[in-house]
Each structure stands twice: as C-alpha cells, then as structure tokens.
C-alpha cells in the first residue's frame, strides 16, 4: 500500500540532512525541531522528578491522569535512535497515553549515546522501572499494576526492560507496548532496510549511524539487551501490543519480534499499519488511522492493567 497522502506530503516537504553529515550536536537540534507540540489534554498533574540511577540521577516526567487513583503505572521510554530526543519531544504522546489509558505515565530521560554507550540506556530504564514500582504511591500510582512502553529505540528499551525484569528479579509487569521497535542490529540488511532505505523518514543510513553511536563494537549486538530479537527465549514475558509501520526500515524486525512472542505463547497483539512510515504517532490528532491505533492501545492497556491477577 502506498504512503498515506498526508504522510507523503509531509516527508516531501521536510528539509532534513543526514545525521552522519550533521554530527551528534546538530543531529539533536534537527531532531527536536520536528517534534510535535503539546496537545490540549487535561491531566491532574505533570511533574519532573529525579530518580537514582546507576550513573547518577535520571530525569523523569510523571503524568498523572484525572480521576480517582491509585492508577496503573505505564513506564515510557522515548524514541530517538539511542542518540537524540528527550522528555520534551514526547510530551505529545505521554499526555495522550495518560489520559486515554487512565494511567500514570513515567517518562524516562535515559542516558544517550555516544556519550553513554550501551548498556547505559537499558540500565537506566530498568532502574527507573524498579524505582517507580517502589514509589508509585507517591504519585498516585499502583506499583503492582505496571507496564512498559516506548517508540522506536524507546521500544527497544521497553522490550529489554521486560526481558530483564523476567530474568533479573522483577518488578512484575502486566504488559509491554512497542511502537515501531528496533529489535535487532542489522548484521545483514533485512529486506525492509533496502526497500525503505530513502524517502520514508528514518533512512537506512541514519539507522546505521545510530547503531554506530550506540555500540562500542558490532560484537556487542549479540547481547540480547542490545538486540532483544536475539534473546534465547521469549517465554514468560508479559503480554505485548506491537505496532509496526509498513514503510519503515524497521518493519521486518518489528514483525519478527511480535511473531517470536506469539510463537513463545505470549499473548500478543501484532499489527502492521498500512500506509504509515516510521514515527507515525506524530500524526495523532491529524490522521484517523493513527488515532485508531491509539484507541486500540488505550483499550489494550486498560485490559491488562485493570484485570485481576491470576
């Protein structure tokens, strides 16, 4: 299916330069310039906090929905290829998730590469998740009803946090929501890296450049905490909701991850989104198709976070 006309028009109008050409500092400026603004959504509170982490304090933003708590808790890890973007650039989606799913969203400003190579980011995300589980009552949350979520490289962080929580003593998670996830270092370029190499937002070269910044060496990609698709087993992971953009270099690995979860017996909603490109959530409030994806997400989260255990 061709790109949605609105997405295609926006991509053609974008005047962006390759990150490899810009370098890290200017890449960060360019990436933030394209971030959506805050939606007009009422929440009970939005506050910034500092979380003790393995490399020092981790900045985080807590979005508390209206209504009577305690609310379930959704950890959120922002996208940006392990290198760019931050808390501010993802207000647009965190506010929607908090209001739509009636959960406290804890957005984590994990350490970025190249200043902080792998595994700094995943270590921060696990530490923040454990902190939120232990301190949820302080912000109107229920630490026994938690899920993880993220976009792109943030979805990598969410998937890895779910794996590590399973293998390294918790906390117990009720679900994981992965939007167009990065799940595997491209040792051999998948077909989608070639089909959608240019002209669809996230280019093949930008994604390869991100990996170069993130890993000390390609050998580190064998670690499932870097490439969660390489985990030995998906059994025992929390239920998953995985959304994959059709026209995206990450399409194939996103589908492969969802399929591996299903094959391992993990209850998984896997949805390829026709006519979309990477970062399609930025069209929330503009494209009905994107709003439908979010409506599905809200309903799915309400289901896994409010049902009784057992």
Task: Pin down the residues of each PLM region.
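Hydrolase active-site cap/lid region
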Residues: 163-219
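Short beta-strand element of the alpha/beta-hydrolase
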Residues: 70-80
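Alpha/beta-hydrolase active-site loop
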Residues: 116-136
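Short amphipathic alpha-helix adjacent to the substrate-entry channel of hydrolases
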Residues: 88-107
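A glycine/proline-hinged amphipathic helix-loop "lid/cap" segment
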Residues: 1-62, 306-310
């Amino acid at each position: 299916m061709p790109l949605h006309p609105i997405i295609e028009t926006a991509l053609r109008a974008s005047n962006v330069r390759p990150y490899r050409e810009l370098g890290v500092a200017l890449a960060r400026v360019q990436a933030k310039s394209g971030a959506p603004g805050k939606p007009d959504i009422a929440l009970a509170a939005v506050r910034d906090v500092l979380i003790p982490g393995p490399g020092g304090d981790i900045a985080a933003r807590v979005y508390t929905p209206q209504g009577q708590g305690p609310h379930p808790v959704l950890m959120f890890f922002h996208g940006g290829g392990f290198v760019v973007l931050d808390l501010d650039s993802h207000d647009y989606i965190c506010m929607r998730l908090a209001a739509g799913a009636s959960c406290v969203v804890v957005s984590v400003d994990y350490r970025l590469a190249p200043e902080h190579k792998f595994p700094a980011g995943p270590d921060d995300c696990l530490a923040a998740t454990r902190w939120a589980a232990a301190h949820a009552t302080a912000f109107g949350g229920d630490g026994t009803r938690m899920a993880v979520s993220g976009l792109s490289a943030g979805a990598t962080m969410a998937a890895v946090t779910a794996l590590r929580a399973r293998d390294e003593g918790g906390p117990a998670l009720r679900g994981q929501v992965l939007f167009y996830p990065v799940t595997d270092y491209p040792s051999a370029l998948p077909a989608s890296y070639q089909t959608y190499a240019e002209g669809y937002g996230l280019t093949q070269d930008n994604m390869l450049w991100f990996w170069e910044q993130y890993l000390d060496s390609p050998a580190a990609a064998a670690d499932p905490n870097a490439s969660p698709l390489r985990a030995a087993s998906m059994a025992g992971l929390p239920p998953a909701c995985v959304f994959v953009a059709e026209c995206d270099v990450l399409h194939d690995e996103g589908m492969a991850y969802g399929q591996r979860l299903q094959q391992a017996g993990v209850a998984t909603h896997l949805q390829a989104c026709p006519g979309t490109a990477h970062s399609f959530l930025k069209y929330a409030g503009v494209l009905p198709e994107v709003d439908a994806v979010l409506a599905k997400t809200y309903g799915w989260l309400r289901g896994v976070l409010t049902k009784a255990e057992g």
